[in-house]
């Protein structure tokens, strides 16, 4: 096999493009709010907690799509018709799990 050697300007250009793309991804993520000092006023603390709550809501928000499938399965099992109950696994009531 013959190794193809790229000239160094092409390699540098590829690295710069990669860094620019990574920089765009980092800017898309929300920044965590900075905590006020220990001698902060109640208004500053209130603003900080509001911005922290907003940040946590953004970071931990629900994402809909393929990950939503187990919830659909759970709702199907929870709200089944009587005709579908024959397909559910049978569990004897006399046996304790402990």
From Swiss-Prot:
Q: Which Pfam families match?
A: Hormone_3
Q: Kindly list the residues the record flags as site (Cleavage).
A: 30-31
**Can you say where in the cell this protein is located?**
Secreted
Residues bearing the modification Tyrosine amide = 64
**Posttranslational mods:** The peptide YY form is cleaved at Pro-30 by the prolyl endopeptidase FAP (seprase) activity (in vitro) to generate peptide YY(3-36).
- Please provide one cellular component term from the Gene Ontology annotations of this protein: extracellular space
Q: Where are residues bearing Phosphoserine located in the sequence?
A: 41
The protein's GO terms of the molecular function aspect are:
neuropeptide hormone activity
Primary location: secreted
Q: Which domain of life is it from?
A: Eukaryota
Q: Name one GO biological process term.
A: eating behavior
InterPro entries to which the protein is assigned, alphabetical: Pancreatic_hormone-like, Pancreatic_hormone-like_CS
The record lists its disulfide bonds as: none
Q: Which CDD domains match?
A: PAH
Function noted in UniProt: This gut peptide inhibits exocrine pancreatic secretion, has a vasoconstrictory action and inhibitis jejunal and colonic mobility.
- Protein name per Swiss-Prot or TrEMBL: Peptide YY
Give the organism's phylogenetic lineage: Eukaryota, Metazoa, Chordata, Craniata, Vertebrata
- Gene name of this polypeptide: Pyy
């Amino acid at each position: 096999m013959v190794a193809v050697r790229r000239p160094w300007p092409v390699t540098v250009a590829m690295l710069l493009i990669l860094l620019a793309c990574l920089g765009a991804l980092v800017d898309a993520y929300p920044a965590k709010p900075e905590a006020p000092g220990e001698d902060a006023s109640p208004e500053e603390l209130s603003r900080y907690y509001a911005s922290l709550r907003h940040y946590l809501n953004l970071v931990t928000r629900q994402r809909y799509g393929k990950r939503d499938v187990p919830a659909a399965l759970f709702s199907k099992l929870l709200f089944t018709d009587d005709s579908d109950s024959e397909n559910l696994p049978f569990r004897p009531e006399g046996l304790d799990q402990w």
